[in-house]
Amino acid sequence: AMAQVMKYHEWPEAPTPVIPAYQTTSFEFTVPQLNATTFRWNEMQNTYEQEDDGDAVAELMRYCGQSILSDYTKLSTGAYTTDVAIALTKYFDYDKNLELKYLEYHDISEWENIIYDEIKAGRPVFHSGYSLGGGHAFVCDGYDGNGMFHFNWGWGGSHDGYYKLS
């Protein structure tokens, strides 16, 4: 979801700083430092015919994962949503006034207005949800005018569609 929002904005334009190495929590292996890079936005597509065609988006996703200290297991990748906002400003030159908002501090009407205003302004919204069993990050990128919001779940189009926020 983080990479999808970054691709939408095609930002940053300038090279990233070095992203330091860290040790994962589950298997305690060291993820090596990533050197500064400039993302190749023009090479990123929505679909790919050849495996090598995805190298540019794979690089973006690797930098996103490392910037938020992702933990990797055989079945999943995990990170904290709060780390996304930190990484966007620290490593990817996003506005320091970027806000992280939580539904639990708003009623549903306020939340719909917040999301609608972002979509109307041309800004897809990074979302996440979680339970005791795990979580998932996804993107809200549209509104139908009838109280339904479009979500991209990040599963190659599977289950993407319009849903109520409630």
Residues of each region from the PLM?
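Active-site-adjacent substructure of cysteine-protease-like catalytic cores
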Residues: 86, 90-152
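N-terminal leader/propeptide and maturation segments of large enzyme subunits in energy/redox metabolism
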Residues: 45-48, 67
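Active-site nucleophilic cysteine motif
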Residues: 1-7, 53-57, 72-88, 136
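Second-shell loop/turn segments in exported
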Residues: 69-77, 102-105
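Sec-exported extracytoplasmic/periplasmic mature domains
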Residues: 2-11, 69, 89-94, 120
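Catalytic Cys-His active-site segments of thiol-dependent hydrolases/isopeptidases
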Residues: 146-165
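Active-site nucleophile-adjacent alpha helix/oxyanion-hole segment immediately C-terminal to the catalytic cysteine
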Residues: 1-42
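Flexible glycine/proline-enriched surface loops and loop-helix/loop-strand junctions
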Residues: 60, 64-72
